[in-house]
């Protein structure tokens, strides 16, 4: 399961944030989603974008909907979102 080529429109992600929140290493996440460690690094850096299958595996691993992990627009910092909710 290799990442897909980059489309012309960027896809932003929260993979690194979600992985570290859960105390997972890149190697642990790679094992859970069935890819190699380098793929996780490339996804976190947005060097590559995931296939639909890989995006669904990440969604299952983090127990979040895909749109909570990936977006066509930049995510606002979590601290900003939390502050605005109060």
Task: Describe each PLM feature range.
Residues 13-28, 32, 57, 83-85:
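Short basic helix-loop element that most often maps to the first helix and adjoining turn
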Residues 53-68:
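DNA major-groove recognition helix of helix-turn-helix/homeodomain DNA-binding modules
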């Amino acid at each position: 399961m290799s990442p897909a080529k980059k489309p012309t429109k960027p896809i932003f992600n929260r993979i690194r944030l979600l992985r570290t929140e859960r105390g997972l290493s890149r190697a642990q996440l790679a094992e859970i989603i069935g890819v190699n460690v380098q793929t996780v690094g490339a996804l976190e850096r947005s060097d590559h974008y995931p296939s639909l299958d890989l995006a669904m595996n990440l969604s299952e691993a983090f127990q979040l909907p895909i749109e909570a992990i990936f977006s066509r627009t930049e995510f606002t910092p979590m601290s900003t979102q939390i502050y605005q909710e109060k």
